[in-house]
Regions:
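Extreme N-terminal basic, low-complexity initiation segments
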Residues: 1-12
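DUTPase catalytic domain/fold
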Residues: 2-4, 17, 26-178
């Protein structure tokens, strides 16, 4: 069996412990990184967010609301998670919808993916929207979104007179068919 060892986050093993996992019969290296989290008073009594399976990309975020929040059809609400995270430079946290809430209840995120930057130190909050025809109630401890870490590439724009042409050109918004 051959192993390919990718660069760890930040290029240093000290910032990331690599562990091996066996996923669907394939050997894979998964990066594991510890993220500092501060819990707020309204988080008390809830478990820390975690991966639900060995191969899960994201950790499920929980609603830390004190009272149930009912979303009428078309309504949106800012739902607290009760946590503040400290990401190292070079990482972002992407806040994504949970597919089960979307397919079963029409609940998704209004801005998806939401981005938590490495220099943000406020509470992680989730903007939920109800696309269904019936009301939906968010209760304390409900898994409402998932958080996936991603590496960030800094962008520096450079103004030029011409761009290299491509076969696609300026075609967009459905130009390739359905």
């Amino acid at each position: 069996m051959q192993w390919i060892r990718p660069n760890s986050i930040g290029g240093s093993n000290s910032r990331s412990n690599l562990r091996t996992a066996r996923l669907r019969g394939h050997s894979t290296l998964m990066n594991e990184i510890k993220i500092q989290v501060k819990t707020l008073p309204h988080f008390e009594g809830l478990p820390l967010p975690q991966h639900q399976t060995e191969g899960a990309s994201g950790i499920d975020l929980l609603a830390a609301c004190q009272e149930p929040i009912t979303l009428q059809p078309g309504d949106r609400a800012l739902v607290p998670t009760g946590i503040i995270i400290a990401l190292p430079p070079g990482l972002e946290a992407q806040i994504r919808p949970r597919s089960g809430l979307a397919i079963k209840h029409g609940i998704t995120l209004l801005n998806t993916p939401g981005t938590i930057d490495s220099d943000y130190r406020g509470e992680v909050q989730i903007i939920l929207i109800n696309h269904a025809r019936e009301p939906f109630t968010v209760t304390r401890g409900m898994r409402i979104a998932q958080m996936v870490l991603a590496e960030v590439v800094k962008t520096k724009l450079e103004v030029v007179d011409n761009l290299e042409g491509t076969r696609r050109g300026a075609g967009g918004f459905g130009h390739t068919g359905h």
